[in-house]
Amino acid sequence: MGSIDTPPHLPYRLDGKVALVTGAGRGIGAAMAVELARCGAKVIVNYARSSSFANAVVDEIKSLGSDAVAIQADVSQVSQTVRLFEEAVQVFGGLDIVCSNAGVVSFGHLSEVTEEEFDRVFSVNTRGQFFVAREAYRHLNSPGRIILMSSNTADSFTVPKHSLYSASKGAINTFVRCLAKDCGDKKITVNAVAPGGTVTDMFHETAKDYLPNADKMSKEQILQIVANVSPLTRCGYPIDIAKVVCFLASSESEWVNGKVLGVDGGAA
């Protein structure tokens, strides 16, 4: 009897899938978008303000042989989030994966935090992500993937003057556990990644808030200090987070649900 040749299974492939990544114009979001495309997905590249960065990501994705479009929307505004999803499902005929990456950083001692700063941080990092998840549930194909963005500072890695940001991300950890229950009827999994310090194009701008006297250090000195926080003695980069996101987006992650995956090299 002749054997029937079957092609080998290639893990983490996303061929035929459509992904939406919020805050995908630069940094971790851009790396997510490109890596999802590298795995075969078509990608909606969301951005709030800078179309030039988003269009550069679209061009890079197209150079890989996949397809992408950029759509502007500020996810701190629920009406714009609703519009984003309505437009996104029209582009490639549906959505299979939603990655909520848009966020803002904040530093301030308890005595200095204003109502305006509180609202700014929570409107994007917490409220914004919640309503991205709501619209994802409404629009995702079944089975689907929702991947939210937390932080290692939301749990066991505390930083002075970082309470607003940390708490805004801590809420995401609770969302993930609860929303996984709500989304089960559509076979949609809900997880989050929790990066540590990650070297992006904005890394050195924010280092002064994380490290004492960073304004007096060279870039090399800052990188060495950050590398030593991890037992692996290296810095984290956007691609490190993007690879984990691609796993969570794939069929291989089907039995991972309601979890927050730390991606910080063991720093926390």
UniProtKB/Swiss-Prot annotation:
SMART domains associated with the record: PKS_KR
Catalytic residues (UniProt): 150-151, 165, 169
Enzyme class per UniProt: oxidoreductase
E.C. designation(s): 1.1.1.-
Residue spans crossing the bilayer: none
GO molecular function, one term: oxidoreductase activity
Keyword annotations: NADP, Oxidoreductase
UniProt pathway annotation: Secondary metabolite biosynthesis
Family matches, as InterPro entries: NAD(P)-bd_dom_sf (IPR036291), Sc_DH/Rdtase_CS (IPR020904), SDR_fam (IPR002347)
Pfam families the record matches: adh_short_C2 (PF13561)
GO process terms (BP): secondary metabolite biosynthetic process
Residues that coordinate or bind NADP(+): 28, 74, 101, 134, 165, 169, 200
Gene3D superfamilies associated with the record: NAD(P)-binding Rossmann-like Domain
Keyword Nucleotide-binding in record: no
PROSITE patterns per UniProt: ADH_SHORT
PANTHER family: OXIDOREDUCTASE, SHORT-CHAIN DEHYDROGENASE/REDUCTASE FAMILY (AFU_ORTHOLOGUE AFUA_5G02870) (PTHR43639), SHORT-CHAIN DEHYDROGENASE_REDUCTASE FAMILY PROTEIN (PTHR43639:SF1)
UniProt record similarity statement: Belongs to the short-chain dehydrogenases/reductases (SDR) family.
Function: Short chain dehydrogenase; part of the gene cluster that mediates the biosynthesis of agnestins, dihydroxy-xanthone metabolites. The pathway begins with the assembly and cyclization of atrochrysone thioester by the non-reducing polyketide synthase Agnpks1. The atrochrysone carboxyl ACP thioesterase AgnL7 then breaks the thioester bond and releases the atrochrysone carboxylic acid as the first enzyme-free intermediate.
Stated name of the protein: Short chain dehydrogenase AgnL6
Gene name as annotated: AgnL6
